[in-house]
A protein has these predicted regions:
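Non-catalytic accessory/interaction domains
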Residues: 1-388
């Protein structure tokens, strides 16, 4: 019954367009069906057609599967919609020209889902952002797509691909900040540039802004932004640790922000012994009074730039989870896991997570599900080869 599958059971279907129709795939293997209607946009003789298609079975006949552009353009359905080879090619050429902003947003979401499900390569997605985002004016679409871009860049590219794309991506963001972006979009590109910056040129640019250099037209920063810039600079250039500390302590007047800054900053130290001491302190309940600050420390300790040195923290992060649940806020176990695992992409960490779950077959189900959810990116990375 509709109520049983939608309300009383977990999971969601994967919806994939095939030559002989629309497949609804239940990844649990139970062959469940989620009855629904989707809005399919397809290309026929140069004309973009849209039609409502009811899905009532594991396979629904559909004649135009090979020319589908957007599997659910009006966002009526529920599930993971996978791009087709045709939709990838079409969006590669036309995404920035689509007039309907909803369809553009759906196109970006579809391509990002394609990266997560190995239908689209991360490098392709990054290049598509550089190609099509300059034409995008809608702030919601820009923000959403830049969040996808940051995720793909930090998680779904190998180190070699990251290095190959680094200069182009920095130039793109810098150009959008200084020249092409409009209004609120400038700040979105500025924040993305800060999160991905690696070159000495861009780091020097950010250091200048922290120290009072003139901001690009249309960009404003507050004390929270200054602290974020300081954290990123301390992470990327350990020689600047004391310099940025001194600048923040001298220029920021808000006591709450300064207290947070002083609490979190040691987690960015270039000295691993200092970082180890910070991590070990977080394992002691008395030091976890401010759980938001704790999660921020843990996130910096396990930042992608420190992921190799931080791998040894992972077993203890998992091992502390029961205590975290017993002593913390109801939401703290999830934020603890997200901060501790999201920066890691190695097969070694994936093995650590699987080993932990295998060694604890009777682990509380709610915590097991949180571990699986926060290590899902690792499962996606190591679940097979990309098809494009």
């Amino acid at each position: 019954a509709w109520n049983e599958i939608w309300i009383k059971e977990s999971g969601a279907p994967v919806i994939e367009f095939q030559k002989n129709g629309i497949a609804m795939i239940d990844e649990s293997g139970k062959k469940r069906v989620w009855p629904q209607v989707i809005s399919v946009c397809w290309n026929y003789m140069g004309l973009k057609q849209g039609t409502l298609v009811p899905l009532r079975d594991t396979l629904t006949p559909f004649r135009h599967g090979e020319s589908v552009v957007l599997p659910d353009g009006e966002v009526l359905g529920y599930g993971c919609f996978l791009p087709t080879e045709y939709s990838i090619r079409f969006l590669d050429e036309e995404l920035g020209k689509i007039g309907n902003p909803l369809y553009r947003a759906v196109g970006w979401q579809l391509l990002y889902e394609g990266v997560l499900n190995k239908k689209v390569k991360g490098e392709f997605f990054v290049k598509l952002c550089i190609k099509h985002l300059p034409a995008e004016k809608d702030n919601l679409i820009v923000n959403r797509t830049l969040s996808f871009l940051r995720s793909v860049y930090s998680t779904y590219l190998d180190e070699g691909s990251r290095q190959l794309l680094q200069d182009d991506l920095e130039r793109f963001c810098m150009n959008m900040v200084n020249n092409k972006a409009e209004g609120k979009n400038k700040k979105s590109y500025f924040n993305t540039l800060l999160s991905i910056c690696s070159s000495s040129k861009t780091c020097s640019y950010m250091a200048g802004i922290l120290q009072g250099a003139e901001l690009p037209t249309g960009v404003t920063i507050n004390d929270q932004d200054r602290i974020n810039i300081a954290f990123n600079l301390a992470l990327r250039d350990t020689s600047m640790y004391e310099e940025v500390k001194g600048y923040v302590m001298k220029t920021v007047r808000n006591k709450d922000l300064l207290d947070r800054f002083e609490y979190v900053l040691p987690s960015l130290s270039g000295n691993k012994q200092v970082r180890d001491s910070v991590f070990n302190a977080l394992l002691v309940n008395e030091n976890r009074v401010n759980e938001v600050w704790v999660a921020e420390c843990l996130r910096w300790l396990n930042h992608p730039r420190r992921r190799m040195e931080a791998e040894e923290y992972v077993p203890k992060i998992l091992g502390a989870l029961l205590e975290i649940q017993e002593t913390g806020d109801i939401f703290f176990p999830n934020s603890w896991l997200n901060a501790g695992l999201s920066g890691h992409t190695s097969k070694n960490v994936y093995s650590m997570v699987n080993t932990f779950l295998e060694k604890h077959p009777n682990y509380p189900q709610n915590l097991k599900l949180k571990i699986l959810a926060n290590s899902d990116h690792l499962r996606r990375i190591y679940s097979g080869e990309e098809t494009r």
